[in-house]
């Protein structure tokens, strides 16, 4: 259709006519949905993961865990527009990364996003930032309860620059695997990379204190569920925004996302009840996460029946690796992955990537990408099994590349940082937690008989003047009413 033709423009309602604020190429529906989708993805992190992390950890780490997520979100946005966006989606510098450049000029941000997207570049930049930000925050889930916050402040921009941009450019940008791998919304780029990098960084940072490893109850399960709700509903924008247009792929992706997730939760709960004789709310949140992650690389490219099957597998295979294999394997036991990000994101991400290579429907691939390969299952029935095998080879190649790159680069970043700043907090601070790290605590009232803990950090506390150089708090008996 020729959208420049006066024949079509003359029949448009006045509200849809092009003007100075909305040029002819701008599809207002696509534009509005993309801004909504990007906002939903942002809400997955702030407040979603901020609440989830702050509630899922031991009480003494609530502030630090939430703060790590909030900092990463802010830092990634600044780095993204200053250099990282063009490294991920700009002009090719190397086969796996683009040239760093600003994404700040009005001319650039208000230009058409691409030949296939009828919306401003600003929408694309913001949506991709939200993807990058949540990747760093997911990675941080492996490091909660011991990483030095100053080291985290340096780790975030380094990992974004040296790792995330490479994965995004290689698979989604103009890299050597672009157009070959089926990764609809980030099963490899976001989830496999965050799971592998988080596990690797956890190795270099070292474990939590022995007491924290053995006794690490969530401080507020109900709040944790609220954060999980932001994640689940926010995935409507996560997978629904990936086509960058309002169409049938968007609708199918959203439907499949929630169908797979619900199936995964039910399977996880069933396994918990079969083995441990009772269901677990924390376990159901883990099952929710694995379902969301597994469907992500193929959300708009598979039929609903395949989404149900993917949900069944994402609720069982990561359950086995986390609840059985992790406890038996000396390898897994040697690395303290605080929230099990390796299982919920790396295992579920690679599972989803492989299953997307099996179940991707040729018609849906053509609608979204144009000329493309075919899933293994459909290539078998179409008498073109060679094409399906080739696609599976690319899926495996992508998984191997993302895994190796993240292990190597994350290790180098941690080794480099450790030469300038300690990766983990001092042992005495690890015993105290938030009060030592930030001079703040999550809850004023806590424990039997309810005790009030007042921070003694003089530059923050509005209640008492400077008393001691120690940044710890002391119990004050609650005044009898």
Swiss-Prot record:
The chain crosses the membrane at residues 37-57, 63-83, 124-144, 152-172, 185-205, 221-241, 249-269, 282-302, 305-325, 339-359, 364-381, 396-416. One of its GO terms (molecular function) is ammonium channel activity. GO terms for biological process: ammonium transmembrane transport; arbuscular mycorrhizal association; response to symbiotic fungus. It is a multi-pass membrane protein. It comes from the Eukaryota. It is found in: Cell membrane. Keywords: Ammonia transport, Cell membrane, Glycoprotein, Membrane, Transmembrane, Transmembrane helix, Transport. It holds the Pfam family Ammonium_transp. Residues 1-36, 84-123, 173-184, 242-248, 303-304, 360-363, 417-481 are extracellular. SUPFAM superfamilies: Ammonium transporter (SSF111352). PROSITE patterns: AMMONIUM_TRANSP. The keyword Amino-acid biosynthesis does not apply. Disruption phenotype: Normal arbuscular mycorrhizal (AM) symbiosis with AM fungi. Plants missing both PT4 and AMT2-3 fail to establish AM symbiosis with AM fungi in high nitrogen conditions, leading to premature arbuscule degeneration (PAD); these phenotypes are not suppressed in nitrogen-deprived conditions. Induction: Accumulates in roots during colonization by arbuscular mycorrhizal (AM) fungi (e.g. Glomus versiforme). GO terms for cellular component: periarbuscular membrane; plasma membrane. Mostly expressed in mycorrhizal roots. Also observed in the cortex and endodermis of non-mycorrhizal roots. Glycans are attached at residue 4. InterPro entries: Ammonium/urea_transptr, Ammonium_transpt, Ammonium_transpt_CS, NH4_transpt_AmtB-like_dom, RhesusRHD. Belongs to the ammonia transporter channel (TC 1.A.11.2) family. Involved in ammonium transport. Required for arbuscular mycorrhizal (AM) symbiosis with AM fungi (e.g. Glomus versiforme and G.intraradices) in low nitrogen conditions. This is Ammonium transporter 2 member 3. It comes from Medicago truncatula.
């Amino acid at each position: 259709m020729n959208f420049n033709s006066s024949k079509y423009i003359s029949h448009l309602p006045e509200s849809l006519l092009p003007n100075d604020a909305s040029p002819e190429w701008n599809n207002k529906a696509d534009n509005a949905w993309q801004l909504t989708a990007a906002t939903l993805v942002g809400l997955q992190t702030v407040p979603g993961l901020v609440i989830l992390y702050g509630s899922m950890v031991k009480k003494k780490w609530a502030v630090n865990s939430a703060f790590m997520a909030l900092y990463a979100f802010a830092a990634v946005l600044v780095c993204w527009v200053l250099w990282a966006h063009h490294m991920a989606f700009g002009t090719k510098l190397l086969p796996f990364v683009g040239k760093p450049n600003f994404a700040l000029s009005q001319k650039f941000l208000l230009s058409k996003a691409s030949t296939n997207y009828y919306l401003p570049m600003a929408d694309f930049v913001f949506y991709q930032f939200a993807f990058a930000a949540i990747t760093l925050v997911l990675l941080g889930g492996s490091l909660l309860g011991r990483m030095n916050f100053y080291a985290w402040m340096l780790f975030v921009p380094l990992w974004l620059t040296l790792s995330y941009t490479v994965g995004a450019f290689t698979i989604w940008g103009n890299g050597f695997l672009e157009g070959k791998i089926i990764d609809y919304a980030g099963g490899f780029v976001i989830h496999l990379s965050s799971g592998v990098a988080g596990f690797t960084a956890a190795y270099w940072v070292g474990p939590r204190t022995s007491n924290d490893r053995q006794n690490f109850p969530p401080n507020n399960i109900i709040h944790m569920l609220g954060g999980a709700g932001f994640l689940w509903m926010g995935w409507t924008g996560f997978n629904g925004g990936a086509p960058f247009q309002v169409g049938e792929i968007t609708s199918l992706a959203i439907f499949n996302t929630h169908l797979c997730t619900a199936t995964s939760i039910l399977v996880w709960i069933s396994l918990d009840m079969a083995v441990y004789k009772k269901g677990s709310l924390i376990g159901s949140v883990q099952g929710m996460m694995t379902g969301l992650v597994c469907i992500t690389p193929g959300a708009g490219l598979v039929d609903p029946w395949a989404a149900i099957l993917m949900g069944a597998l994402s609720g069982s295979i990561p359950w086995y690796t986390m609840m059985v294999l992790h406890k038996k394997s000396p390898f897994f036991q040697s690395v303290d992955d605080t929230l099990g990000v390796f299982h919920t994101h790396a295992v579920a991400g690679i599972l989803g990537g492989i299953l997307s290579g099996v179940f991707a429907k040729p018609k849906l691939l053509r609608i979204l990408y144009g000329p493309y390969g075919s899933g293994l299952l459909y290539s078998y029935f179409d008498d073109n099994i060679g094409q399906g095998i080739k696609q599976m080879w690319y899926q495996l190649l992508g998984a191997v590349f993302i895994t190796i790159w993240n292990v190597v680069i994350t290790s180098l970043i941690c080794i480099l940082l450790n030469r300038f700043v300690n990766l983990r907090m001092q042992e005495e601070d690890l015993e105290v937690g938030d009060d030592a790290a930030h001079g703040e605590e999550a809850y004023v009232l806590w424990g039997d008989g309810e005790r009030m803990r007042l921070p003694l950090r003089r530059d923050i506390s509005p209640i008492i003047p400077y008393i001691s150089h120690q940044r710890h708090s002391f119990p004050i008996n609650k005044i009898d009413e």
